[in-house]
Regions:
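C-terminal structured "cap/appendage" subdomains that terminate the fold
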Residues: 216-235
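Hydrophobic/anchoring residues in structured secondary elements
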Residues: 25, 142-144, 205, 251
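Alpha-helix N-cap/start motif
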Residues: 19-20, 246
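Generic long, charged, amphipathic alpha-helical segments
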Residues: 21-27, 196-220
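Cofactor-centric catalytic regions
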Residues: 2-15, 28-165, 176-199, 255-261
Length: 261
């Protein structure tokens, strides 16, 4: 999916001071953990990553307290410290418990309140061209600026933004859901359009890193961020070009034709 296993392995490796290739992320077992609620809020890196950071630091502290690991060490020395600990004391384990940020006020029973410990921010700028014969809109260039805390993996993060922007361009210009008799009438790739590589412009991704105290090494989640801003940016660019405000999505050619009279 979004590369969570890679990011979580990186967080553990950085906290332990070892290479990422030495970290295996075990498959999650929902029977062994409490209910964490619905799949929302782009929170895996921030919440699970913080737990992993805390547990990894605790594991390193255990080795240090046992006199098996110094302040500076190599991968070989870390491996040796782990082996020696197991030989002397048994299994080497570290545990971590999630603590919500103090300003969160959430009622699990009523499902009300503010459940978010941090927000990511973004600015999007779209350059568009409108064909005045066909009224087709094309996005020619796109700039996406994100403030997402510390970026753990720049390649994965940029890919997440680029993919989200491409999806949002489809939402803004192409993806028109037609309902008929309570059913989606255009549920085929022949009549439900999504952008292809030809329709996707160059996407310039810029990250501004402002560390968040509630995330691992200052990281925040970014999963849903690029779906929020591109459509308004595209609509604003069309308004700037044609002098008309469009108030519904997708912005189809017939929508512009009607608006221009």
């Amino acid at each position: 999916g979004q590369g969570a296993n890679t990011v979580l392995a990186q967080i553990a490796a950085e906290a332990l001071g070892i290479g990422c290739d030495l970290v295996d992320v075990a498959p999650p077992d929902t029977a062994a953990v409490p209910n964490s609620g619905p799949t929302v809020a782009s929170r895996t890196t921030m919440v699970v990553g913080k737990l992993i950071e805390s547990a990894a630091l605790g594991l390193k502290k255990t080795l240090t307290a046992a006199g098996l690991l110094g302040e500076v060490y190599s991968t070989r020395q870390f491996r040796a410290a782990c082996r020696d600990y197991v030989a002397l004391y048994g299994p080497l384990r570290a545990f971590s418990q999630y603590h919500a940020p103090p300003d969160i006020r959430w009622d699990d029973e009523r499902y009300r309140g503010d459940a978010y410990g941090a927000f990511a921010w973004a600015v999007y700028v779209a350059q568009v061209a409108v064909d005045m014969v066909t009224y087709e809109t094309r996005v020619e260039d796109f700039v996406a600026v994100q403030e997402v805390g510390r970026v753990v993996n720049p390649v994965l993060a940029a890919g997440q933004i680029e993919g989200g922007v491409a999806q949002a361009i489809g939402w803004a210009l192409y993806e028109n859901v037609v309902w008929r008799d309570g059913r989606m009438a255009n549920a085929r790739m022949t009549d439900y359009l999504i952008p292809t590589a030809v329709d996707t412009p160059p996407i310039h991704v810029v990250f501004i890193e402002n560390g968040c105290p509630h995330g691992p090494f200052g990281a925040k989640g970014i999963g849903e961020l690029p779906m929020d801003g591109p459509a308004p940016a595209i609509a604003s660019a069309i308004e700037n070009a044609l002098g008309i405000a469009v108030d519904r999505l997708p912005i189809l050619p017939e929508t512009l034709e009607q608006a221009l009279g």
